[in-house]
């Protein structure tokens, strides 16, 4: 990635990816002061020259260990894949290409993929690819309540009495 790629990156994340959010756009990531992070973001192109994935990332040093990690300027990152790349083969291919690149320049990798709640399309293929390639995964509990068609009263009624005060 270079700053000249910002418009292509942001268009891809917001309009062509299945698991991208505004948190992975350059517009958001560039909010942080220049020099705060050593950007290591990648753009992965397919065999036809089309953009298949972006990986917002930065270099983190732990002593002498060079770690390629999800961009610290965002809550989560990980590979952001084209919305049509929802097969295990495509996900493994993208992640393997990223891993091959990382192996030549870094000692370790640390990804924080987009939680399922925020994915525009189901992304179990990417989760499978991480497991298939031997990554360990940290799981965080996230809870959501569908609110479509519900009034504030019926929504509050669905919470236990002792939790209602935390919601108001």
Named regions from a protein language model:
Residues 1-6, 124-168:
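Acyltransferase donor/substrate-recognition loop-hinge adjacent to the catalytic core
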Residues 1-27, 165-168:
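Short amphipathic alpha-helix that is part of the acyltransferase structural core
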Residues 11-14, 27-100:
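Conserved donor-binding loop and adjoining core beta-sheet/short helix segment
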Residues 77, 107-109, 139-143:
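Generic beta-strand structural signal
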Residues 99-104, 133-136:
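Short, charge-rich binding segments
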Residues 104-115:
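Conserved GNAT acetyl-CoA-binding A-motif
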Residues 117-121:
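Acidic-and-aromatic substrate-binding clefts and catalytic sites of carbohydrate-active enzymes
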């Amino acid at each position: 990635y270079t700053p000249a790629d910002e418009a292509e990156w942001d268009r891809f994340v917001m309009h062509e990816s299945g698991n991208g959010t505004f948190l992975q756009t350059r517009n958001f990531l560039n909010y942080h002061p220049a020099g705060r992070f050593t950007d290591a973001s990648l753009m992965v192109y397919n065999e036809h020259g089309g953009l298949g994935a972006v990986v917002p990332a930065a270099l983190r040093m732990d002593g002498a260990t060079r770690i390629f990690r999800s961009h610290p300027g965002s809550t989560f990152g990980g590979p952001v894949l084209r919305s049509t790349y929802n097969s295990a083969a495509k996900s493994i291919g993208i992640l393997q290409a990223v891993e091959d690149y990382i192996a030549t320049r870094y000692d370790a990798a640390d990804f924080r993929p987009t939680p399922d709640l925020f994915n525009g399309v189901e992304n179990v293929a990417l989760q499978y690819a991480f497991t298939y390639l031997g990554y360990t995964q940290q799981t965080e509990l996230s809870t959501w309540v569908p609110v479509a068609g519900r009034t504030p009263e019926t929504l509050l009624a669905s919470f236990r009495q002792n939790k209602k005060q935390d919601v108001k």
